């Protein structure tokens, strides 16, 4: 087999925007993510309902609901 054909497998840190740091190993080094299992609504059980651009109001107006 050929030697030195595999990438280096080094210790890495995954840093989330919420401040969580997870230590793991990777071939690409440190990784930055926007959302992780500590802050994702699916894993936390806390749902955030965001009405972006008034979609609910637009729906109610379209179907004449109060």
Swiss-Prot record:
Transmembrane stretches in the record are none
In terms of SUPFAM superfamilies, this protein maps to: L28p-like (SSF143800)
Taxonomy, superkingdom: Bacteria
Pfam families hit by this protein: Ribosomal_L31
Spell out the InterPro entries in the cross-references.
Ribosomal_bL28/bL31-like_sf (IPR034704), Ribosomal_bL31 (IPR002150), Ribosomal_bL31_A (IPR027491), Ribosomal_bL31_sf (IPR042105)
Asked if the Swiss-Prot or TrEMBL record annotates the protein with the keyword Ribosomal protein, the reply is yes
Q: How is the cofactor bound?
A: Binds 1 zinc ion per subunit.
Single annotated GO MF:
rRNA binding
Q: Which residues bind Zn(2+)?
A: 16, 18, 36, 39
The cofactors named for this UniProt entry are:
Zn(2+)
Which keywords accompany this UniProt record? Metal-binding, Ribonucleoprotein, Ribosomal protein, RNA-binding, rRNA-binding, Zinc
PANTHER family in alphabetical order: 50S RIBOSOMAL PROTEIN L31, CHLOROPLASTIC, LARGE RIBOSOMAL SUBUNIT PROTEIN BL31C
- Which named protein is this? Large ribosomal subunit protein bL31
């Amino acid at each position: 087999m050929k030697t030195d054909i595999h990438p280096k497998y080094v210790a890495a840190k995954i840093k989330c925007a919420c401040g969580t740091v997870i230590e793991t190993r990777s071939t690409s080094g440190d990784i930055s993510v926007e959302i992780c299992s500590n802050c994702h609504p699916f894993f936390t059980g806390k749902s955030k309902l965001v009405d972006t651009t008034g979609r609910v109001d637009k729906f109610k107006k379209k179907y004449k609901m109060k």
